[in-house]
């Protein structure tokens, strides 16, 4: 969408609650430079220990990161494995391994696309073209592209060197620091289904090679490993004593093992379940202090450490320290005090061996499940994040600077999901955490009300999804819907509930067993199944409600819940049992709905959004063969232009301008990130984008897209088209709280620019005359046709966007440079009063116009009488200021003449010349005195600060100007006095200049004309 290149979304954060970090590596010779990979955030680099960051991977087609490895012999070479190795229900899959040769400026994919998830990369330090990749594979799929892969030619070709079966991947891969051919791998058999996870099986185990993977030995009971099935294992060599190796082993009985012969034989040293392996499927990594073979770090829900070789562990980072759920760990190989760790909420940095930690608040890695908006001015966005609760923050602010982390307010704990503002009182929101824990929260007071629907009877078990469906009734502000296996409705904001449906799921007992985990149970509600995920009441018919379930049912009632129709197996192209992630009821047609489904959890990556226009009699997959990438996650149809449709997929944002006939990816600095939810703030026509990995983005004012969609995406036939303007507010901006000054380390999301946001399209190809005009002239008029302001703005092909600060034509300040021919008109005049103004844009011989509505700050409206009185006084004062400017121009011209005269006199001789030279110096002195009376003394030649407190014409004029513009109230007698004083001072200065030019300057000119120097011209 090149024609919209000047229309870019703003990333507003937050970063105070970041997201899952899966990979960390640093340059050993300069550890201030390190790299962080987010589960779905891309690769980020800091060159100053975390003070500032830059994104390195945003131009790539995928941002889901599993591993990072820097080639220490040449740190410009970096390898990145995509697809995270933490196979929870919300994992993000990958598409191969990437390599950069220039420190991340450019990247090349080096294969292994079908492995889906690469959890670890090793580089042979003696031969960096030899690289190993641990492919953990797709936990939802059964496929052979798993195990350990090796390249000996820098990634040009790969060989799979370790494989056990189609559900086993490599979960850990470690290299002996003293022998790069000696590697230990953990092969892990595991499989995830939407309702179940199983860890362990015959494909699991520890394998060791001493010849770079040509031959492997599986370590068994005879080697000290546990008998029976094994699961996920963490492995770590002690760099200071490489014969010492540790393994954290998931088995029938989990244990911590130690080898003292380099990994060939093992002994159990700890099997205390309170200390070992709480959630091995999600985190099972261990690390050894590089200088102390007995000090071990175990990263899991918390971080614990051992000082006695694993016999006992104590807490280093508690559950409420930094953030729980730790996935990545890096220790400097020669400075054991420097540690960087990654968790579900970002990264922590320690420089004292873990005694204290600094949380980095600049990485906007938030994984949002949902997004919503209220109707405040400025409006707020709100939503819930994976493992980071639910939050509300401003889409833009009337505060100086950017959108800071502490502008965001925590609403609800746990894993956060949908947040819905009360339409009658935006201080109240509905918010929830996992498993249907829904409540109402007052943002102003913190008052909380839990409103989860009760079971219909005491012993009836309710099933709530990890991410339960909720929706407001568009016809009744007091009514809300909520989903379990039933559809619940409350007509009193959740105080009481009624069930208005039967069980709308498949209600399959085999999918409700709560036995998930395999060798180690992990029953957290993440695998709750046969539940309602999506609820969509029609805004056109109060009796119509659509429901989508996680087990593939699409249900419809047309009578308020009395009867239901299930479309399971009746939607051509939709797999029976596919996950229904979203349903959208049309704002245009009560019979129309969109169903967003995906089936990647069963290995099918088809991209599907189905539409019906006849209550489900017929269906169409509107994404079929349209070139989109990544399975579909969400969609929204514009509420005023039906041709405009947005779709979010696992790999970015896509836009249709022709009612889903075609789609294009929206880039314009927006990355190919997992785009999880979309909504439109209707009053301001903003698209709000919730990403699962890069927090929240706002695409301001989508009216240009509406205009293009109105033409079905066809090319503009005229050279110039002005777009309808959004309402603009003359807002007062307050000072930012918290910090007066700050260094690096303070995150600021991008704020909306000040001023009226205005847009126009240019199609240079439509001008057959080929007349060149690279800038447009913009003029603003009041309702009486008076021109108020003129601007010149750049006119690129495609969309152009600029901002008007509500100012009228201004005047030059006394002594300021005269404008160059063709320069932009002087701005800074008295701002316009709230109202409607006409804007005409002219490009060559083409013109188009629109109306611009300017509104007052709703917090502090200004009465028209006050505005008029202040403007009248300002205009009166400006008359004097203009007189002074014109007068000062005379002495500026005289100074320029003196400079030229001094140049001509330099080196000249003669009595007349000497006399003229003396008079020239006198003229300089005279002008200096005049200048000082108007502007004050200039800085001394001596060193130091010189701020003279001179009372001058300029200070008197400035005091009057400040009195008018700096006061809220209408002008007073005090204002009148200051203006009169300014007028008097200006008159005195103008008279003094006129006396000088008609007297001493005229005499000087006469003297100069009598000499051979011919400078003056009539």
Predicted regions: what is each one?
Residues 1-746, 753-756, 763-765:
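Beta-propeller blade termini and top-face loops
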Residues 439-441, 758-759, 766-789, 836-840:
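Beta-strand-rich binding/interaction modules
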Residues 483, 796-802, 828-836, 846:
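A glycine-anchored, Pro-Gly-centered beta-turn/N-cap motif
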Residues 575, 787-828:
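Glycine-centered tight-turn motifs at strand-turn-strand junctions
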Residues 704-734, 851-883:
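Low-complexity, Pro/Ser/Thr- and charge-rich linker/hinge segments at domain boundaries
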Residues 810-814, 842-850:
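Short acidic/polar inter-strand loop motif in beta-rich domains
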Residues 852, 886-1018:
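Mature extracytoplasmic or organellar-lumen-exposed domains after removal of signal/transit peptides
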């Amino acid at each position: 969408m090149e024609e919209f290149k000047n229309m870019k979304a703003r990333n507003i954060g937050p970063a105070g609650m970041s997201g899952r970090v899966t990979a960390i590596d640093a340059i050993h010779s300069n550890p201030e430079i390190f790299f962080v990979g987010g589960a779905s955030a891309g690769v980020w680099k800091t060159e100053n220990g975390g003070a500032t960051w830059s994104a390195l991977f945003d131009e790539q087609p995928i941002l889901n990161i599993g591993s990072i490895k820097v080639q220490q012999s040449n740190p410009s070479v970096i390898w990145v494995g995509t697809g995270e190795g933490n196979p929870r229900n919300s994992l993000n899959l990958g598409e191969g391994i990437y390599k950069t040769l220039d420190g991340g400026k450019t990247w090349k994919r080096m294969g292994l696309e079908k492995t889906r998830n690469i959890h670890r990369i090793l580089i042979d330090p003696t031969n960096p073209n030899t690289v190993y990749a641990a492919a953990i594979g797709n936990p939802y799929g059964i496929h052979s592209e798993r195990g350990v892969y090796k390249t000996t030619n820098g990634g040009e070709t790969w060989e799979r060197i370790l494989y056990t079966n189609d559900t086993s991947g490599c979960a850990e891969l470690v290299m002996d620091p003293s022998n790069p051919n000696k590697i230990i791998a953990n092969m892990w058999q595991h499989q995830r289904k939407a309702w179940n996870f199983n860890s362990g099986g015959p494909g699991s185990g520890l394998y060791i090679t001493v010849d770079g993977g040509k031959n492997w030995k599986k370590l068994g009971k005879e080697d000290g490993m546990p008998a029976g099935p094994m699961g996920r294992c963490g492995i770590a060599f002690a760099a200071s004593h490489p014969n010492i190796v540790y393994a954290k082993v998931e088995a029938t009985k989990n244990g911590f093992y130690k080898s003292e012969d380099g990994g060939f034989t093992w002994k159990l040293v700890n099997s205390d379940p309170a200390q070992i392996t709480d959630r091995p499927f999600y985190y099972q990594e261990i690390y050894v202090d590089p200088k102390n073979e007995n000090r071990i770090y175990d990263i899991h829900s918390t971080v614990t450490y051992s000082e006695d070789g694993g016999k006992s562990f104590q807490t280093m980072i508690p559950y409420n320290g930094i953030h729980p759920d730790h996935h990545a760990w890096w220790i400097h190989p020669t400075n054991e005090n420097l540690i960087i760790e990654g968790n579900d909420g970002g990264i922590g940095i320690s420089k004292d061996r873990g005694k204290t930690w600094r949380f980095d608040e600049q990485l906007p890695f938030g994984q949002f499940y949902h997004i919503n908006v209220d109707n405040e001015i400025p409006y707020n966005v709100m939503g819930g994040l994976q493992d980071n609760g639910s939050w509300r923050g401003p889409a833009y602010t009337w505060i100086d600077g950017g959108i800071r982390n502490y502008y965001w307010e925590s609403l609800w704990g746990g894993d956060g999901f949908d947040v819905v503002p009360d339409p009658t009182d935006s201080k109240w929101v509905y918010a929830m955490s996992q498993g249907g824990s829904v409540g109402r929260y007052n943002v102003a007071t913190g008052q909380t009300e839990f409103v989860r629907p009760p079971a219909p009877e005491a012993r009836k078990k309710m099933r709530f999804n990890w991410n339960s469906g909720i929706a407001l009734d568009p016809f009744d502000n007091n009514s809300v819907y909520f989903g379990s296996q039933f559809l619940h409705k409350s007509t009193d904001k959740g105080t009481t509930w009624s069930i208005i449906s039967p069980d709308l799921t498949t209600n399959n007992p085999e999918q409700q067993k709560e036995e998930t985990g395999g060798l180690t149970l992990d029953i957290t509600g993440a695998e709750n199944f046969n539940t309602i995920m999506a609820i969509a009441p029609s805004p056109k018919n109060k009796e119509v409600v659509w429901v989508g379930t996680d087990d593939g049912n699409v249900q419809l009632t047309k009578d308020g819940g009395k009867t239901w129709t299930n479309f399971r197996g009746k939607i051509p192209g939709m797999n029976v049992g596919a996950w229904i992630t979203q349903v959208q009821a049309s704002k245009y047609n009560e019979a129309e709905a969109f169903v967003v489904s995906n089936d990647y959890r069963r290995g099918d990556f088809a991209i599907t959004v189905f539409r019906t226009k006849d209550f489900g009699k017929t269906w169409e997959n509107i994404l079929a063969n349209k070139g989109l990438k990544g399975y579909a996650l969400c969609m929204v149809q514009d509420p005023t232009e039906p041709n405009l449709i947005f779709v979010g997929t696992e790999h970015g944002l896509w836009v249709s301008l022709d009612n889903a006939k075609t789609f294009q990816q929206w880039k314009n600095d927006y990355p190919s990130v997992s785009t999880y939810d979309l909504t439109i703030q209707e009053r301001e026509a903003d698209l709000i984008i919730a990403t699962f990995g890069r927090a929240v983005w706002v695409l301001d004012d989508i009216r240009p897209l509406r205009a293009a969609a109105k033409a079905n995406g066809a090319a503009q036939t005229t050279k110039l088209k002005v777009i309808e303007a959004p309402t603009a507010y003359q807002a007062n901006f307050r000072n930012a709280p918290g910090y007066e000054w700050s260094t690096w380390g303070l995150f600021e999301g991008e704020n909306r620019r000040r001023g009226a946001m205005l847009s126009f399209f240019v199609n240079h190809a439509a001008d057959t005359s080929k007349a060149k005009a690279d800038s447009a002239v913009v003029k603003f008029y009041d309702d009486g046709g008076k021109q108020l302001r003129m601007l010149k703005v750049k006119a690129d092909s495609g969309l152009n966007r600029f901002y008007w600060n509500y100012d009228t034509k201004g005047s030059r300040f006394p002594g300021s440079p005269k404008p160059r021919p063709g320069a932009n008109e002087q701005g800074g005049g008295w701002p316009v009063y709230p109202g409607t103004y006409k804007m005409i844009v002219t490009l060559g011989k083409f013109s188009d116009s629109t109306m611009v509505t300017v509104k007052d700050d709703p917090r502090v409206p200004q009465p028209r009488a006050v505005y008029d009185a202040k403007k009248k006084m300002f205009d009166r004062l400006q008359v004097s200021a203009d007189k002074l400017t014109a007068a000062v121009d005379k002495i500026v011209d005289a100074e320029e003449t003196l400079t030229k005269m001094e140049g001509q006199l330099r080196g000249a001789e003669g009595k007349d010349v000497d006399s003229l030279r003396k008079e020239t110096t006198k003229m300089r002195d005279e002008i200096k005195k005049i200048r000082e009376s108007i502007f004050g003394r200039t800085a001394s030649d001596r060193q130091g600060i010189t701020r003279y407190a001179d009372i001058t014409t300029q200070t008197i004029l400035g005091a009057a100007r400040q009195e008018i513009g700096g006061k809220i109230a209408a002008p007073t007698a005090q204002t009148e006095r200051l203006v009169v004083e300014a007028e008097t001072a200006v008159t005195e200065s103008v008279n003094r200049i006129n006396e000088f030019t008609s007297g001493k300057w005229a005499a000087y000119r006469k003297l100069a004309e009598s000499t051979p120097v011919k400078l003056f011209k009539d």
